[in-house]
Amino acid sequence: MEISWGRAMWRNFLGQSPDWYKLALLVFLIINPFIFLANPFIAGWLLVAEFIFTLAMALKCYPLLPGGLLAIEAVIIGMTSAAHVREEVAANLEVLLLLMFMVAGIYFMKQLLLFIFTRLLLSIRSKMVLSLAFCVAAAFLSAFLDALTVVAVVISVAVGFYGIYHRVASSRGEENDMLDDSHIDPHYKTVLEQFRGFLRSLMMHAGVGTALGGVMTMVGEPQNLIIAKAAGWHFGDFFLRMSPVTVPVLVCGLLTCMLVEKMRWFGYGETLPEKVRDVLQQFDDQSRKKRTRQDKIKLIVQAVIGVWLVTALALHLAEVGLIGLSVIILATALTGVTDEHAIGKAFTESLPFTALLTVFFSIVAVIIDQHLFAPIIQFVLQASEHAQLTLFYLFNGLLSSISDNVFVGTIYINEAKAAMENGAISLKQFELLAVAINTGTNLPSVATPNGQAAFLFLLTSALAPLIRLSYGRMVWMALPYTIVLTLIGLLCVEFTLAPATEWMTQAGWLATLS
């Protein structure tokens, strides 16, 4: 029997999302106009809370859909205007170009990155050294590339290796279903569980590595570019200004990596079973024998393009997005990727998040028009200049751990810049606050998958169910990093940031906005 029209519409609305989630969004959409008529300020804050809710519930439904509906309604009822949204998008065009072109560009360098991580996995036998190598490699790559792409590469390595061993363990060849363990011998199951634990720990180390490296440079995370643009910093300026906080945090993060592996705390410490290593080594040997001269040239070309990418970013030869576009052109032209559909696949990872970021800017426009953060900013600015840094760091960290750090970073840097332009704070203080905001949004956000896009990508990937990586387990395994990164970051903002910045300014290392 066919369902009713009403039931059909309900099923189509937000698709497979739970009924309670659909109902909650409908309630939001119904009550918002009435609350806006009664009190625009409260309605604005309610909209922000609703939007954060959609980000927190990203596993129920991709936030672009519910967040987009809320943003469209906000424009319709007059909380902001389409013209203001366009202005916000135009002001942040560099970030959108970064996401569109840089992520797509790195897609065409995946073979090189896969080669690097595969060699790491099979050539290093010590689990502690291997974990450290994955963390350092992810941190270095994320300082120049997009963290999402780095995690995507590590995921593809892990899925590939898991599939190879699972096929051997199940004896089902190409017909093997990686989610089905029913055909696996009990002995193999024990080895498989150990292998899952090994992959879980490596993925978490790599994920945290992207946060450690991503906070250090203006291209490491999307919000970094927004903050750098607001402060007028180039690549070198940004790195130096962040270093009083980010370098100690990096060192302590790597020490934490070694400690949890050594002590086998928080689900870490599992080693790669020898039986699995033998299977993977055989597969890698076969792959290397099959690698043609053409394949080897592709790897060399990608490595040269990687050098160009790092050089162009460091010397600020063009806007970040345009450098990414040059990577796309060079990588496709020199490796023989000429089909439109093959090129189009490179954009599938970045465009949904680019669209979501545009929705962010709509909510930012509402925040500006309704002066939502004015009371918070006034409260913070009433404190001493020294205390302001700590408060900005903590407020950013708290919000970033439950919401998306791009959203939070954009809001706070806009408010801090407005305060400087209004004469409430000095230029010198604004530049210190920009560092506190950047580190506050990047470091504590490793607490949950909601804060780091790369973590959320890992949680929603095909790998997560294979290695039994749930939301709760991810939060638990991230906990030691969350504590160390947040506390060390706070101490550095409190004690080392101002004196180190002053020393670098006097030494002539730092340029200042005029």
UniProtKB/Swiss-Prot annotation:
Any single Pfam family the record assigns to this protein: NhaB
Membrane topology: Multi-pass membrane protein
Keywords: Antiport, Cell inner membrane, Cell membrane, Ion transport, Membrane, Sodium, Sodium transport, Transmembrane, Transmembrane helix, Transport
Subcellular compartments: Cell inner membrane
GO molecular function, one term: sodium:proton antiporter activity
Spans through the membrane: 23-43, 63-83, 97-117, 120-140, 144-164, 202-222, 238-258, 303-323, 357-377, 391-411, 447-467, 475-495
Catalysed reaction equations from the record: 2 Na(+)(in) + 3 H(+)(out) = 2 Na(+)(out) + 3 H(+)(in)
GO CC terms in record: plasma membrane
Coiled-coil region list: none
Stated role: Na(+)/H(+) antiporter that extrudes sodium in exchange for external protons.
Similarity annotation: Belongs to the NhaB Na(+)/H(+) (TC 2.A.34) antiporter family.
Protein name: Na(+)/H(+) antiporter NhaB
Organism: Salmonella newport (strain SL254)
